[in-house]
Every structure is written in structure tokens, then in C-alpha cells.
């Protein structure tokens, strides 16, 4: 199987980051707004899941198998569909990617490429299982919010396109 997670992607470098620095970054990212400082402290304990990606790197590949999703802490990425003429979205700090494969256990549906140097927080299934239940639930709730917001956005786009065609 074509598995490309942070562990397998030799271009992404594991970041040697202090808990204080990681906490400072998490405090600036809206994905973690509903976490208490003590919960964020616990998350920074998973320091081996912080990665640095350089501009232009492919972070995940369409069709690959992986069990991780990523929260962008700094930088910007492009979401790319194989046959699309241009990127289908750009994501910024606080956004996440890879959540579809993480939740469904299916192959990656898009590729993701860094548009700038990025710091990413990787969450995989084993890591999620080792997190305290309240943190795990908040992460899952945040993923649900992300998916609902994206679905609402897609519904709006489909409605506007339908009106143009009619």
C-alpha cells in the first residue's frame, strides 16, 4: 500500500519543540480555542507529533493510505485534486486536513502541498487513543465542526452554481 504519513514522509522533519513554545503556538490557533490551558499542556506532551514542512513539499498524496490528520499551526497549504486545473482550496493556521481518511479509513481523496514553511500537529489513531477522554472528545467535536462547515460551504457553492445554470 502507498502509505505516506509524517513518519513515512522523509521530507517532513520532526520538530524538536519545547512545551512552552508549543503551548504558545497552540494558543494562537483557533482549532484549540475550546481547550483549557491544562488540556493544551497535555497536548504539548505529544511533542513528537509536531512537524516542520518546507514550502513546496507534498504533505499527503491523493490515493495514499494513512491514519493521520494534521492541524496547521503556522503556514499555508493548498488542497489539490488530481485532475483539477488549480488547487481547490487553501488552508491556514487553525485549519486541518486529512480528516476524511482519518475518520473513514479510506484512501486520501486529495493531495496537500505546502505553500509556505509550515508547522503541523499530527494526530493519528494511536495518539488519539492515548489522549485523555475530554481532550479526545474535544478533538472529535472540532473535526465534526470542520466537516459541517465544509459541507455548508459546499452546499452554498452547489446552490449558486445551480442558479447560474438554470
Enumerate the predicted regions with their spans.
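Cytosolic regulatory regions built on CNB/CRP/Popeye-like sensor folds
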Residues: 1-166
Amino acid at each position: 500500500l502507498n502509505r505516506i504519513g509524517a513518519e513515512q514522509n522523509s521530507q517532513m522533519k520532526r520538530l524538536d519543540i519545547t512545551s512552552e513554545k508549543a503551548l504558545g503556538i497552540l494558543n494562537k490557533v483557533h482549532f484549540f480555542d475550546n481547550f483549557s490551558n491544562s488540556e493544551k499542556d497535555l497536548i504539548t506532551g505529544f511533542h513528537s507529533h509536531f512537524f516542520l514542512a518546507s514550502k513546496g513539499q507534498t504533505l499527503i498524496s491523493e490515493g495514499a493510505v494513512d491514519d493521520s490528520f494534521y492541524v496547521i499551526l503556522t503556514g499555508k497549504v493548498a488542497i489539490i485534486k488530481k485532475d483539477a486545473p488549480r488547487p481547490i482550496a487553501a488552508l491556514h493556521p487553525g485549519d486541518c486536513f486529512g480528516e476524511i481518511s482519518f475518520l473513514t479509513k479510506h484512501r486520501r481523496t486529495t493531495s496537500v502541498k505546502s505553500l509556505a514553511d509550515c508547522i503541523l500537529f499530527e494526530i493519528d489513531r494511536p495518539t488519539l487513543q492515548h489522549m485523555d477522554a475530554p481532550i479526545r472528545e474535544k478533538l472529535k467535536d472540532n473535526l465534526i465542526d470542520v466537516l459541517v462547515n465544509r459541507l455548508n460551504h459546499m452546499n452554498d457553492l452547489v446552490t449558486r452554481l445551480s442558479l447560474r445554470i438554470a
